[in-house]
């Protein structure tokens, strides 16, 4: 989604929200949370408050009128009723074949509400220096996580990674094989963005940065001589990230056409650009997700940009056997989250079994 459109949709949602949601928004913007994250949270609050109105928990007629006391007095049974509403809501739609909203979706909704309740009960201060209220009902609401061993998760993810020579083969496929299948009209569109698309995918595969970190890169953040980029990690922390050498020619090729192809001016600081009606804009995360899905599905299997992050992490662990190094590359404070990659790279375990 283009930044201008994203901000427009955020403003539209904010216009309907209660005052305490607007305070929450400003507080998280200062952290800073990304506009994309805040937009997703606002959508979750909109869904929750619409349910509050429909359920009769409040006498308010509009979302903006829902008093803070409604959240303060929300019971565990009320919140469980909301979860059931989410789970059963698709059944009301005659056009759906699903039995209910996925648990992942429900967990995402509850995560947004947990963030709001933590802010209201712990982080915000009134004139007396106290939170607005103390009772956090979200601490009593259980969430169900998908039960899966690390080994099982690793095996599932492994099928969607481009390991070994497949990393370079994927880039070469986009460059030379993919365009052979296109119509003249589609080929024209592909050629316009070919260098940019290859540069984005090469960077994701060569650095393991998150999608949000990649799209928010500015020109000043790129050092091709040292092959290092500066990114803003979760929580607003700045970090220097090394980039594998194989990405350099793709990044250089994109830079060579960036100004002329996308009509970029000195004021256009974004590294990765898109052009809409002759005006350059920072490319948005949604466009990159669609682009990665399109190319990867045609090559082997449809994947997300996050799977490209997993690809880099797995290849790096395979080469170094160092969880500390992988954690540092990914921007994680702990090596616990990198345990997954030790299970993906399990040749030693398989070799041991073969000897039995």
From Swiss-Prot:
Listed InterPro entries: CB, DNA_brk_join_enz, Integrase-like_cat_sf, Integrase_catalytic, Integrase_recombinase_N, Integrase_SAM-like_N, Recomb_XerS, Tyrosine_recombinase_XerCD
Source organism, top-level taxon: Bacteria
Classification via PROSITE patterns: CB (PS51900), TYR_RECOMBINASE (PS51898)
Active site: 210, 234, 306, 309, 332, 341
Membrane-spanning parts: none
Main location: cytoplasm
Keyword Cell division found: yes
Role, per record: Site-specific tyrosine recombinase, which acts by catalyzing the cutting and rejoining of the recombining DNA molecules. Essential to convert dimers of the bacterial chromosome into monomers to permit their segregation at cell division.
Family: Belongs to the 'phage' integrase family. XerS subfamily.
PANTHER family tied to this protein: PHAGE INTEGRASE-RELATED, TYROSINE RECOMBINASE XERC
NCBIfam families, alphabetized: PRK05084.1
Protein name, entry field: Tyrosine recombinase XerS
Source species of the chain: Streptococcus sanguinis (strain SK36)
Gene name, Swiss-Prot/TrEMBL: xerS
């Amino acid at each position: 989604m283009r930044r201008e459109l994203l901000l427009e949709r955020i403003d539209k949602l904010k216009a309907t929200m209660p005052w305490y949601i607007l305070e929450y928004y400003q507080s998280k913007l200062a952290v800073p949370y990304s506009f994309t994250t805040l937009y997703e949270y606002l959508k979750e609050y909109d869904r929750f408050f619409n349910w509050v109105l429909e359920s009769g928990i409040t006498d308010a007629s509009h979302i903006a009128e829902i008093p803070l006391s409604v959240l303060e007095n929300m019971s565990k049974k009320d919140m469980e009723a909301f979860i059931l509403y989410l789970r059963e809501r698709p059944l009301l739609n005659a056009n759906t074949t699903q039995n209910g909203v996925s648990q992942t979706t429900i967990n995402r909704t509850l995560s947004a509400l947990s963030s709001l309740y933590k802010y209201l009960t712990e982080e915000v201060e009134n004139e007396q220096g106290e939170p607005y209220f103390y009772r956090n009902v979200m601490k009593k609401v259980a969430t169900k996580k998908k039960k899966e061993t690390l080994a099982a998760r690793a095996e599932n993810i492994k099928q969607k990674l481009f390991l070994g020579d497949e990393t370079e083969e994927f880039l070469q496929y986009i460059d030379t094989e993919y365009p052979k299948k296109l119509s003249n009209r589609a080929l024209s569109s592909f050629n316009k963005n070919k260098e940019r698309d290859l540069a984005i995918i090469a960077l994701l595969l060569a650095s393991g940065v998150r999608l949000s970190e990649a799209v928010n890169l500015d020109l000043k953040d790129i050092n091709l001589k040292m092959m290092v980029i500066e990114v803003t990690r979760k929580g607003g922390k700045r970090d220097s990230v090394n980039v594998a050498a194989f990405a350099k020619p793709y990044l250089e090729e994109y830079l060579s056409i960036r100004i002329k192809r996308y009509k970029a001016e000195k004021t256009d600081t974004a590294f990765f650009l898109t052009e809409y009606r002759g005006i350059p804009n920072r490319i948005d995360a949604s466009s990159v997700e669609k682009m990665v899905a399109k190319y990867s599905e045609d090559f082997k299997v449809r994947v997300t940009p996050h799977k490209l992050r997993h690809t880099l992490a797995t290849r790096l662990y395979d080469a170094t056997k160092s969880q500390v190094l992988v954690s540092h590359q990914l921007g994680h404070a702990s090596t616990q989250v990198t345990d997954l990659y030790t299970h993906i790279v399990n040749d030693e375990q398989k070799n041991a079994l073969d000897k039995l």
